[in-house]
Amino acid sequence: MTATLERRESFSLWERFCSWITSTENRLYIGWFGVLMIPTLLTATSCYIIAFIAAPPVDIDGIREPVAGSLMYGNNIITGAVIPSSNAIGVHFYPIWEAASLDEWLYNGGPYQLIVLHFLLGVASYMGREWELSYRLGMRPWIFVAFSAPVAAASAVFLVYPIGQGSFSDGMPLGISGTFNFMLVFQAEHNILMHPFHMAGVAGVFGGSLFSAMHGSLVTSSLIRETSEIESANYGYKFGQEEETYNIVAAHGYFGRLIFQYASFNNSRALHFFLAAWPVVGIWLTALGVSTMAFNLNGFNFNQSVVDSQGRVINTWADIINRADLGMEVMHERNAHNFPLDLASNEVLPVAVNAPAVNG
């Protein structure tokens, strides 16, 4: 009888750590991107909560007129926000150690940069983690490609736009009313509603909602009948059952008759690719549009483009939008400038649109 003795393999602490990090058996997959994602998102979240509750007012315009954004300084959930970094800081990197004191860092809006930069690192790492888990499981990589759309949109408003405009004070405030203010000022300065890429994004978001609702309702309505003709089809299945209940042929036939034949998909993979690609491409284009408007390549300008035979302007909706833009331009940063350049550089415009004289 021969006995064979084998030396038991011993794994170092590092090897066991690597195995645990990359294991797909964990309840929540961590991955190497998760090693970066977890601390950055925890930092951004904790700083955001503290700043939203207790941050002191921030000198956003750099003119020694602080703006309060936290709950402890009189705001509520709707009006509260983390105020962007001061215009006096510009696009300089402004960590805590660059300030002379913590009070100075808070006064100049340092928490905004800390939150935004950690958040962008965190969501980019989350996107990489989606790819990493797909790779480990032998899946295709399209989940992370789809998530790149909201990552691109967040990067556009929080990073690219402030860089293009020369200051983090132009970034989107981290709050509800601050987001609305950002949207109104963006329209006033860049005419985003007249930008083709924004139009594509609107089509992507609303179209994606429509297609999602249509698809979900069709799937829910298309049952494989398990009952007789005299019983309701609803008795033939239980909510959440594992067995297939969806008949794509029936759904295809219904929708093809409702609209027309070629408006319906009879291939499940093509259908779901379309459902994913439509909103993703739309949001990609919107992010690209915001990134170009960051450098003042703005939306279309059709102001005063229609004139009569005497050279008098016939106002169109473009002129109405332009007047609204000028009004918003005047209202924002009311103390940072004496007169907006958009008004100072053009000829004087009447406040109201003149109605034509009617001879009765």
UniProtKB/Swiss-Prot annotation:
Domain of life: Eukaryota
GO terms for biological process, alphabetical: photosynthetic electron transport in photosystem II; response to herbicide
Positions that bind pheophytin a: 126
Residues reported in the UniProt entry to bind [CaMn4O5] cluster: 170, 189, 332-333, 342, 344
Catalytic activity: 2 a plastoquinone + 4 hnu + 2 H2O = 2 a plastoquinol + O2
Amino-acid positions noted as binding chlorophyll a PD1 in the UniProt annotation, renumbered to this chain: 198
Site (Cleavage): 344-345
Subunit field text: PSII is composed of 1 copy each of membrane proteins PsbA, PsbB, PsbC, PsbD, PsbE, PsbF, PsbH, PsbI, PsbJ, PsbK, PsbL, PsbM, PsbT, PsbX, PsbY, PsbZ, Psb30/Ycf12, at least 3 peripheral proteins of the oxygen-evolving complex and a large number of cofactors. It forms dimeric complexes.
Record protein name field: Photosystem II protein D1
Top-level taxonomy: Eukaryota, Sar, Stramenopiles, Ochrophyta, Raphidophyceae
Primary gene name: psbA
